[in-house]
Curated annotation (Swiss-Prot):
Domain of life: Archaea
Molecular-function annotations in GO: hexosyltransferase activity
UniProtKB keywords: Glycosyltransferase, Transferase
Record family assignment: Belongs to the glycosyltransferase 28 family.
EC numbers: 2.4.-.-
Record-given protein name: Uncharacterized glycosyltransferase MM_1636
The organism's taxonomic lineage, starting at the top: Archaea, Methanobacteriati, Methanobacteriota, Stenosarchaea group, Methanomicrobia
Top-level class of the enzyme under EC nomenclature: transferase
One Pfam entry name: Glyco_trans_1_3
């Protein structure tokens, strides 16, 4: 089959799971092309896949550890391209795919629908209107319009793929709210993770070891600094801090001896596998990667970002790790780290999810779904 994969470029998690799916599809002999923008486009290109530049849809901005909704809406409108729709339509017409897979990229979803091409939508959040709750009246009205728009899109897609564990283990469950009429369209694939636990080699890290994955947004710098302060409180716990592409490690002058800082790392899986816990924001894909590798999570969701806060709340409630905040002092962060390291229940719970991820094999499951459903229409 010929398959077009569209990727939302806000947050690298969309890209990582689409690369996982692309790897699986290519290995099975399918012809794949990607559409992406921003960092996502760069990552796909570096991987060596065929990639097309597509118009951006959403622009996320923040400040001092918080998600700035009004600023994000303004930035999105400023970056909107009037001719974006025709460009995406032409891209699809030129490639002539048998099926379109869209990871939260709605312009590509609508274009596929317009051309009567089967479309499979990958999302880990359906209640986007929650972003707009308790805001000013104009933004609340925008939330109502958003809800109606997404409901229409969901009804017209061939399938909605949730790249998460099936219930009751679904980490993004607080972000999902589908009407009963859509339930038969939902497909819980399991995590879409590019590497398999058993295929990733461990690296020699001094134990116990914490890896911090702070990436994407410069406004997460305060928590980066706070982790450095936390590390200085106990030299017996070792840290690797991966700063992300928008944060320059050279700006940090006093680095504790038990800390190494790395710039953007192309492959974080060896660090996730070899560490005893992962410090991360509340992004869904990073959580899926950590849990698929059986590593507990210390989550610092972006303040005001309801999707991340909901993900982190499930991590806390289910005992997969701890939910912290940007206001949590270093002394408390350290105690939470010690708790996760010392209390066996955290490791036992995430090891169960590691086994389940292996059994589900998300990329393979989605490939087989596409072959079974879209492949029938092609033949």
């Amino acid at each position: 089959m010929k398959i077009m994969i569209f990727i939302c470029g806000e947050g690298l998690g969309h890209t990582s799971r689409c690369l996982a799916l692309g790897k699986e599809l290519l290995a099975a002999g399918h012809e794949i092309e990607f559409g992406a923008y921003g960092y996502s486009r760069d990552l796909v290109e570096k991987t060596g896949y065929r990639i097309h530049e597509i118009p951006s849809e959403i622009k996320l901005v923040g400040k001092a550890g918080g998600f700035d909704l009004s600023g994000s809406i303004e930035a999105t409108l400023k970056n909107a391209r009037i001719l974006g729709g025709p460009k995406v339509l032409k891209l699809i017409k030129d490639f002539k795919p048998d099926v379109v897979v869209s990871d939260s990229y709605y312009l590509g979803t609508l274009a596929a629908m317009l051309l009567n091409i089967p479309v499979y939508l990958i999302i880990n959040q359906s209640n986007m209107e929650d972003f707009f709750k308790n805001r000013g009246v104009p933004i609340r009205l925008l939330g109502d319009l958003t809800k109606k728009f997404y409901r229409e899109v969901f009804e017209k897609t061939d399938k909605i793929i949730i790249p998460d564990y099936p219930l009751p283990y679904t980490v993004c469950r607080k972000n999902l709210n589908f009407s009963p009429g859509l339930w038969e369209k939902l497909y819980y694939s399991g995590p879409l993770v590019k590497e398999k636990y058993e295929e990733v080699e461990q690296i020699p890290l001094k134990k116990p070891h914490i890896v911090s994955l702070i990436g994407g947004f410069g406004y997460r710098e305060p928590i980066f600094r706070k982790v450095l302060t936390t590390a200085a409180l106990d030299s017996g716990i070792n840290y690797t801090l991966i700063s992300g592409p928008s944060l320059d490690p050279s700006k940090f002058k006093e680095i504790p001896k038990n800390v190494q800082i790395l710039r953007f790392v192309g492959d974080t899986f060896p660090y996730i596998r070899s560490s005893d816990a992962v410090i991360a924001p509340g992004g869904h894909s990073t959580m899926m990667e950590a849990l698929s590798f059986g590593t507990p999570i210390l989550s610092f969701p972006d303040e005001g970002h309801s999707e991340q806060e909901n993900n982190a709340a499930v991590i806390e409630e289910e005992g997969y790790g701890r939910m912290l905040s940007y206001s949590t002092p270093p002394e408390v962060i350290l105690e939470c780290i010690r708790e996760v390291l010392e209390d066996k229940k955290y490791r036992d719970k995430v090891k169960r999810l590691q086994r389940l991820a292996s059994e589900l094999d998300g990329p393979k499951a989605v490939r087989e779904l596409l072959e079974k459903e879209a492949g029938k229409k092609v033949s």
